Structures are given as structure tokens and as C-alpha cells.
């Protein structure tokens, strides 16, 4: 599977059960990165994608039953269910237990330090930084994309 994750300068991912930040341009780039294929995530992450794209029906939002919506595949066990080559957007959980299944990591760096209590925990020692690029976001002057391969 391919892991997509956003981190701050200290590899922080969340603080007090909340994402550190989000960015509209970044979400669009993540959707483009998947090339229209299935993108795995949990319901917490799915909310930010659906609300921004404006395609979450009110009754689904109110009921909390998000399920699947086209390209986005929401499931609390998404890291267990994702198949080879399938992208997974991770915000709120450890990836280390799935290290043996990870084929690629796409790290988006916020270029800021935020408070954090959950950190990226998959060591990239021995991995190759295949590509690095910077781009302006909607709420961040610079977001850095790093692609790692084993």
C-alpha cells in the first residue's frame, strides 16, 4: 500500500485527537495523486474531503454514516483492508504495525511546528527520497511533498 500523511516540522500528526492543520490545495493534490483510483481513509479523514468537495448529503452528515463516496473508501480498518498499491491517507493512527506492507510513503510537510501528541512512527531509515517538491497551499505558504520508496 501507499501511505499518504501530513506532518509538521517534528513529524507531528495530531494534537488532542485533532488534526494539526488542513489545506484545500493539498486535498486537491492528494485526489489527483490517486489518479481517480480508490483512496482509503477512515471516517474522520473523509469528512474533510467530502465537506470541501461539497458532495456530502446533509442526511449523511447528520447521521454520521459516511461510508463510501466514489473514489473515497472509508473504513476504520482501512490499513488492514487496503491492497497492494492502494493509497491510504493516514491522520490519526500508527503506521509502524503495517511497515511490511508499505510500498511507498508520500509525506506532506506543513513547514511549521504545531503542538503534537501523535507522531509519524514509521522509520524511513534505508528508504530512498525519490522526489521532493514545494508548492503553495491555500492556508500554508509552502507545503513540501516528499516521496519515499524502499
What feature does the model see in each segment?
Residues 1-150:
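Enzymes that bind and transform nitrogen-containing heteroaromatic metabolites
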